[in-house]
Amino acid sequence: MIIGVPSEVKNNEFRVGLTPDSVQVIVSHGHTVFVQAEAGLSIGYTNDLYIKAGATILQSAAQIYSEAELIIKVKEPIESEYQYLRNDLTLFTYLHLAGDPEKAKKLISTGVRAIAYETVTSADGSMPLLAPMSAIAGQISIVVGSYHLLKHNSGKGVLIGSFGDISPRVVTVIGGGVAGTEAITKATENNAFVKVIDLSQNKLDELKLQFGNENMEYILSSPENIKDAISVSDLVIGAVYVVGKEAPKIVTLEMLKNMKPGTVMVDISIDQGGCFESSRPTTHDNPTFLVDEVLHYCVTNMPGAVPLTATQALNKVTLPY
């Protein structure tokens, strides 16, 4: 098979579909790999490293797409890439089409065979190709949330941890899946008081066994419970995911009116349409906006902020496929 790895073109997206180590494994099985020039340069993967691994370097995306039978990417194609898609090409990447039906229609119109990382499901119901990026996004959500709580970022001007007799700040995590669990882990490491909200009592019980009771509160999801929790929170993490579907809008515009000015909301679910009614996609260049004095962070490719870690983690799980 002829495999192509184009450069990512989404805003501040520095991940790459294959590492040189992955290329070496694929080539050893008799396949041909074309990599676009400097596709991995920003994370230290030079053209020479790919050549030594057995890849051939091509200069343009047009060349990569025209030569390949299988395209391996990280993020969904953007408008400028649709021209390269065709009915005898297979695309293997994150697509997150549930929140963007127009993009789904455009992909269908090209005839391309598209396989979404995030919907590949194991026999046990887990999503092995989504999990590592969800975990990274969960950790990043606390990092960027804490940063945007700083006063010069329009936040409250607080640190989420406790200091001596100063009570810890409140972090609410909505959704107890992979991303939510990692966000909880990071928040507890920073000595925050964490409120966890989930639809499943069984999931809440599992999380309680994992994290205990100290500085933790476990809340069964309902509109009233969500409203009450976020009204006293300093940082709210939205980590809701429904396989292949648009994220439900669980925090309404009306709820924002009860929140304190400078509260930060991080919507990890934004690549599935967002789980806050007030959310809209943002970029690493311009990541935040205010609604009712509540700061929203809605970057659609959060793991792109740590591209080397994310690329290595992604390749570890995608290579077997």
What is each residue range found by the language model?
Residues 6-7, 11-45, 152-238, 288:
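Glycine-rich phosphate/diphosphate-binding loop of Rossmann-like nucleotide-binding domains
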Residues 31, 86-89, 110-112, 260-263, ...:
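A short helix->loop->beta-strand "cap" motif at the edges of active sites that frequently abuts
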Residues 12-17, 80-84, 93, 243-251, ...:
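Glycine/threonine-rich flexible loop motifs
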Residues 66, 70-148:
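Phosphate/diphosphate ligand-binding glycine-rich loop within oxidoreductases
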Residues 54-67, 218-229:
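Short acidic low-complexity segments
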